[in-house]
Amino acid sequence: MGGISNMCIIASIPKNTGTITKNTLETMCNNNSHGFGIAWIDENNKIQISKSMDQKQFVKKCLKVQNDYGKKSDILIHAR
């Protein structure tokens, strides 16, 4: 019998509803450390995607994207 298997975590943040904290992002990454992604809609109405295997870089990117786009775009954050 195998060990414990974690499912991916996906946070869906509708525009102008708040943000995921640094602490929560770090917890998501610690529990699902096999890669991370974030998607949002930019000022040109284009979907943007950022992927990373580096937790610190990813958390920093998520905080920036939420700050820059959270009031005008839905955001998806994924940890696998």
Model-predicted regions and their roles:
Residues 2-61, 75:
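Extreme N-terminus nucleophile/cap motif
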Residues 59-80:
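A basic- and aromatic-enriched beta-loop-alpha substructure that forms the phosphate/nucleotide-
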